[in-house]
From Swiss-Prot:
Entry keyword Disulfide bond: no
PROSITE patterns referenced in this protein's UniProt entry, alphabetically: AA_TRNA_LIGASE_I (PS00178)
Location(s), subcellular: Cytoplasm
Name of protein: Glutamine--tRNA ligase
Pfam families named in the record: tRNA-synt_1c, tRNA-synt_1c_C, tRNA-synt_1c_C2
Species assigned in the record: Haemophilus influenzae (strain 86-028NP)
A GO biological-process term: glutamyl-tRNA aminoacylation
Protein family membership: Belongs to the class-I aminoacyl-tRNA synthetase family.
Single GO cellular component term: cytosol
Domain of life: Bacteria
The gene coding this protein: glnS
Molecular function via GO: ATP binding; glutamine-tRNA ligase activity
Taxonomy of the source species: Bacteria, Pseudomonadati, Pseudomonadota, Gammaproteobacteria, Pasteurellales
Length: 557
């Protein structure tokens, strides 16, 4: 049964059509595969970002659509950059997005023994050799896009010698950088990836899964295809930058003794989102330099950052559905992402009132205290109502009052009337100012006959503003987030700090209505006339409420 969110956001459960589903349809129809088995294979060297959300939705979505399976596999072949913290965060992100992997999470490191055996098989077939060129020498020998490479002087070692040297590498008898295992393919290939790529290198580093068992680690290109084959993946889907690597993917599998049919790799365009950065290296620098508040800072493009900001799983899934799957690289406008969360929250978020830049209002002819009611959602009666204490002293937003204004200003003006949302019509009679000329109090009168109805004498009151009781409220901190960068493509900048938006976070102190005392972390609210907000999952608590701006009420604000 679909949730209300899924219904409102569109066709999450409808059939998708793209070049990958076309391939799968043909494979199933021809009998090449009887079922579909995909995988999502992140390297645990950072937190997942919005680009990974596209890959997650694609791989898990295909498995769901074709009633198949999808594995979560950690491509953990570089112990220097990886950490169990990233493993845990990736699992949490995938589950939060609404997906469940087949069985237990897999690790490429589960296959280290098998991978070592396949590497030895390539040596025995004369298809791999131990090279002792230094990394600099190897670069020099590799050639360029316009010049062929040169064979290493170690390329023609005997099979016996290579097996013995590979064993020595495994036993820690070479220092780091002094030896590597390379596939023997073609140093004159027009494809750089096929010029005798390194398939094993030495790293004396403890691994988060295997400890100190290994001091040699397989390279991604060697590991990935074999892991797919071991797990019987039918369709190995990755982004376009791995297109040339497919040649190596196929070469490795075709030259080892592994169960057929072999998996095949398909590439789609990665997500390029306007104004965001997805380089893990550059994101890590932002974290390490404390430019942001960790990987889950609400300005970060990470899934955990978007979650903390107030994005919902349904909104991210819908965004990925709308941008689709193609082979063409393009840049998606950030407003397309914002539209998805805005639609979701407009449909599902309860309403509340918050005054972010408060100024005091005193209603001089109101002496008692009333408890009014207001719907939690104008179109969703099943979400119920809330109580609004109405008192002699209130707060309104400073921007909602002027001493003088033209007719276009439909808020409170000295000597004129405005309606308070879900309450009465009030009239501004006079103001009190401090020594600097700043308004400290607006003195008003109210019309007691205007609760839920227009003035009896037929006079028109056009404006409506929000308010909070100055007595029954909760102080709150409001974090008004904006884009982290001032340019559309921050990834192209050498110095990303030079394009940081100095106003990406503005903090205000104000008040929220009483009903938000126990606001649930990450739950979205529409603060009427202000925007969509959620309680911060890290810092908000009942005695110190903190609300993050998720998105404005309308595009362009």
């Amino acid at each position: 049964m679909m949730s209300h969110t899924e219904t409102s956001l569109g066709a999450e459960n409808t059939r998708t059509h793209n070049f990958i589903t076309q391939i799968i349809d043909e494979d199933l129809a021809s009998g090449k595969h009887k079922s579909v088995h995909t995988r999502f294979p992140p390297e645990p060297n950072g937190y997942l970002h919005i680009g990974h959300a596209k890959s997650i939705c694609l791989n898990f979505g295909l498995a769901k659509e074709y009633q198949g399976l999808c594995n979560l596999r950690f491509d953990d072949t570089n112990p220097v950059k990886e950490d169990v913290e990233y493993v845990d965060s990736i699992k949490a992100d995938v589950e939060w997005l609404g997906f469940k992997w087949e069985g237990e999470p897999r690790y490429a490191s589960d296959y280290f023994d098998a991978l070592y055996g396949y590497a030895a098989e390539l040596i025995k077939k004369g298809l791999a050799y131990v090279d002792e060129l230094s990394p600099d020498e190897m670069r020099e020998y590799r050639g360029t896009l316009t010049e062929p490479g040169k064979n290493s002087p170690y390329r023609d070692r005997t099979i016996e010698e290579n097996l013995a040297l590979f064993e020595k590498m495994k036993n820690g008898e070479f220092a780091e950088g002094k030896a590597s295992l390379r596939a023997k393919i073609d140093m004159a290939s027009p494809f750089m990836v096929m010029r005798d790529p390194v398939i094993y290198r030495i790293k004396f580093a403890s691994h988060h899964q295997t400890g100190d068992k290994w001091c040699i680690y397989p390279m991604y290109d060697f590991t990935h295809c074999i892991s797919d084959a071991i797990e019987r993946i039918t369709h190995s889907i990755c982004t376009l930058e791995f297109q040339d690597n497919r040649r190596l993917y196929d070469w490795v599998l075709e030259n080892i003794s592994i169960e057929r049919p072999l998996p095949h790799q398909y590439e789609f365009s990665r997500l390029n989102l306007e104004g965001t950065l997805t380089s893990k290296r550059k994101l890590l620098k932002l974290v390490n330099d404390e430019i942001v508040d960790g990987w889950n800072d609400p300005r970060m493009p990470t899934i955990s950052g978007l979650r903390r900001r107030g994005y919902t799983p349904a909104s991210l899934r819908e965004f990925c559905r709308r941008i689709g799957v193609t082979k063409q690289d393009n840049v998606v406008e950030y407003s397309a992402l914002e539209a998805c969360i805005r639609e979701d929250l407009n449909e599902n978020a309860p309403r509340a009132m918050a005054v972010i830049d408060p100024v005091r209002v005193v209603i001089e002819n109101f002496e008692s205290e009333a408890v009014l009611t207001a719907p939690n959602h104008p179109n969703r009666p099943e979400l119920g109502e809330r109580q609004l204490p109405f008192t002699k002293e209130l707060y309104i937003d400073r921007a909602d009052f002027r001493e003088e204004a033209n007719k276009q200003y439909k808020r409170l003006v000295l000597g004129k009337e405005v309606r308070l949302r879900n309450a009465y019509v009030i009239k501004a009679e006079r103001v009190e100012k401090d020594a600097n000329g700043e308004i400290t109090t607006i003195f008003c009168t109210y019309d007691p006959e205007t609760l839920g109805k227009n003035p009896a004498d037929g006079r028109k009151v056009k404006g409506v503003i929000h308010w909070v009781s100055a007595v029954n409220n909760h102080p709150a901190e409001f974090r008004l987030y904006d884009r982290l960068f001032t340019v559309p493509n921050p990834g192209a900048e050498d110095d990303i700090e030079s394009v940081l938006n100095p106003n990406s976070l503005v903090i205000k102190q104000g008040f929220v209505e009483q009903s938000l005392a126990n606001a649930e972390a990450e739950k979205g609210y529409q603060f009427e006339r202000e925007g969509y907000f959620c309680a911060d999952s890290k810092d908000s608590r009942p005695e110190h409420l903190v609300f993050n701006l998720t998105v404005s009420l309308k595009e362009g604000f």
